[in-house]
Amino acid sequence: MKLFPGLLFCSLVLGVSGQWYSFVSEAAQGAWDMWRAYSDMREANYKNSDKYFHARGNYDAAQRGPGGAWAAKVISDARENSQRITDLLRFGDSGHGAEDSKADQAANEWGRSGKDPNHFRPAGLPDKY
């Protein structure tokens, strides 16, 4: 009689453990996707391409699964919030005001929702990206 509850308990623990590992793995891979998009944006240094790279990083991360989508949201929100703080300290000197932040967040959400990031791709951006 005690064998069945023991097996049930172990299977539940192992099942949750497997899901947790999958989520963490997806989150790590999603964070890497976000970093790769950021690195590509810096390397490309192409005018009006930031929304594309925001959408692409979020899209790639979200394709990993729930963990990737979570990582993309956390990283995107942290980036935008840190920009707001630096804008306050620099009195808007960075050129990333509230309007730009809202547009960035819209591109982030566009990508996370699975929509094509090429919607934001500027004309002339090299095919490498």
UniProtKB/Swiss-Prot annotation:
Propeptide: 112-129
Tissues in which the protein is found: Expressed by the liver; secreted in plasma.
Signal peptide interval: 1-18
GO CC terms of this entry: high-density lipoprotein particle
Keyword Signal: yes
Listed InterPro entries: Serum_amyloid_A, Synovial_Prolif_Regulator
Region of interest (Disordered), ranges: 92-129
Coiled coil: none
Localization, UniProt: Secreted
Induction trigger: Upon cytokine stimulation.
Keywords, in A-Z order: Acute phase, Amyloid, HDL, Pyrrolidone carboxylic acid, Secreted, Signal
Positions of post-translational Pyrrolidone carboxylic acid modification: Q19
Disease (UniProt): Reactive, secondary amyloidosis is characterized by the extracellular accumulation in various tissues of the SAA protein. These deposits are highly insoluble and resistant to proteolysis; they disrupt tissue structure and compromise function.
Family to which this protein belongs: Belongs to the SAA family.
Functional summary from the UniProt entry: Major acute phase reactant. Apolipoprotein of the HDL complex.
Protein name: Serum amyloid A protein
Organism for this UniProt entry: Canis lupus familiaris
Gene: SAA1
